[in-house]
Amino acid sequence: DWLEVMLGYMQEPDVAAVGPMLLLEDGRIQSAGHSHTPYPHNFYNGRSINELGELGILKVARECTGVTGACMMVRRNAYFEVGGLSKSFPLSFNDVDLSFKFLDRGYRIIWTPFARLFHFETATRPNVSTPQEVELITNRWGNRIYNDEYCRIE
């Protein structure tokens, strides 16, 4: 099942987080991991799960810059090592910030299409990013946001 699939990647000690393919209510992709080219967003948002993606990227587990906090399996000691989620991002970008903290410490983040879950995005909160959050994430991680080492295609 999906939980065992994600747990399998956590057997590698340098993996800090694993995320599944998240689907919208209508079955299209909500997130295939994060991409930060040219700004933080969900990779392949709105695309069909039947697509291969460039170079077959939607059909293989891969390292990525980050995964969506809606469903992110996290290694406990890595979470505490990096200071966990930041209170500076109460609505948006908290998963982006956490992912970058993991990467800065040398951990890997894995996205897998072999675990799939529905994500009813914004069903419990508004889909907003405050100007302060946008400015803070850009100031804190601009060097990484504008140079996504895992995603140079889309």
PLM features: what roles do these ranges have?
Residues 1-7, 56-83, 88-118:
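A short, conserved alpha-helix in the catalytic core of glycosyltransferases
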Residues 1-40, 108:
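Conserved donor NDP-sugar-binding/catalytic core segment of glycosyltransferases
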Residues 14-17, 31, 44, 67-68, ...:
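Short glycine/serine/threonine-biased micro-segments
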Residues 26-27, 38-64, 68, 73, ...:
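C-terminal, non-catalytic tails of nucleotide-sugar-dependent glycosyltransferases
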Residues 25-29, 92, 118-120, 124:
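Flexible loop/turn segments at secondary-structure boundaries
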Residues 21, 102, 113, 121, ...:
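Residues at the C-termini of beta-strands that transition into short coil/loop
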Residues 11, 84, 104, 139-142:
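Residues at helix-coil transition
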